[in-house]
């Protein structure tokens, strides 16, 4: 059990890869801090494994990320699963959607890593 008692933050943990990863880390004995913007699905995740700590977090919000991460001492691992994809032709992507993509895919990774 190499992950036993390791403190791991998993972003986008409410569904998909983030959820599967959070559950797998918890099963291996890690202390998992699961974040997502979808609080309802985070609550479902907590019901699946009571050892997972959940927190509603917009990982593109600098002050929220800073406050949250500073509340956890000695983080061992960050598993950043947040992602946003524009589906369709790039010519149909407006500047707001492009900015959202940059914020979610790049800026949030920068904030969480700091």
Language-model segments: residues:
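Substrate-binding pocket helix/loop in short-chain dehydrogenase/reductase
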Residues: 89-90, 97-99
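Conserved glycine-rich cofactor-binding loop
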Residues: 14-15
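Rossmann-fold cofactor-recognition segment
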Residues: 49-62
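Flexible N-terminal pre-Rossmann segment of NAD(P)-dependent oxidoreductases
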Residues: 1-9
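Conserved glycine-rich Rossmann-like NAD(P)H-binding loop of the short-chain dehydrogenase/reductase
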Residues: 28-42
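Conserved NAD(P)H cofactor-binding loop of Rossmann-fold oxidoreductase domains
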Residues: 82-87
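A short, exposed helix-loop element centered on a Lys and neighboring polar residues
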Residues: 113-114
């Amino acid at each position: 059990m190499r992950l036993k008692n390791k403190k791991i933050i998993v972003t986008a943990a409410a569904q998909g890869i983030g959820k599967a990863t959070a559950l797998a880390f918890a099963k291996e004995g890690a202390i998992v801090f699961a974040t997502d913007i979808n609080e309802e699905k985070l609550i479902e995740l907590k019901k699946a494994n009571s050892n997972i700590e959940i927190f509603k977090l917009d990982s593109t919000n600098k002050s929220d990320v800073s406050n949250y991460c500073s509340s956890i001492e000695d983080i061992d691992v960050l598993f950043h699963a947040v992602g946003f994809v524009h589906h369709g032709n790039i010519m149909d992507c407006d500047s707001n959607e492009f900015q959202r993509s940059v914020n979610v895919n790049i800026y949030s990774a920068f904030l969480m890593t700091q």
